[in-house]
Amino acid sequence: MKYFSVLVVLTLILAISVGQSNAIFVDVLDNVETALHNAAKAGFKLIKPIEKLIMPK
């Protein structure tokens, strides 16, 4: 969750300092954040069944 907060703050800083017309960096960071988020979701989907096998309720 920390990477998400850092990327959000960095994106806001770049959006304010660069402006809307030159916000290429913001788009790149948004794509990176989306890719990281999707990778994290996929990782949780893979790990959850293994966790249930190791630590049953």
From Swiss-Prot:
Q: Which UniProt key words apply to this protein?
A: Antibiotic, Antimicrobial, Immunity, Innate immunity, Secreted, Signal
Task: Give start-end of the signal peptide.
Answer: 1-23
Q: Which GO terms describe its cellular component?
A: extracellular region
Would I find Secreted among this entry's keywords? Answer: yes
Superkingdom per UniProt: Eukaryota
Task: Tell me the Gene Ontology biological-process terms attached to this UniProt entry.
Answer: defense response to Gram-positive bacterium; innate immune response; male-specific antibacterial humoral response
UniProt note on tissues of expression = Ejaculatory duct of adult males.
Keyword Flavoprotein appears in the UniProt entry: no
Which signals induce this protein? Answer: In response to mating.
Cell compartment(s), UniProt: Secreted
Question: What does the sequence similarity comment in the record state about its family?
Answer: Belongs to the andropin family.
General function of this protein: Male-specific peptide with moderate activity against Gram-positive bacteria.
Q: What is this protein called?
A: Andropin
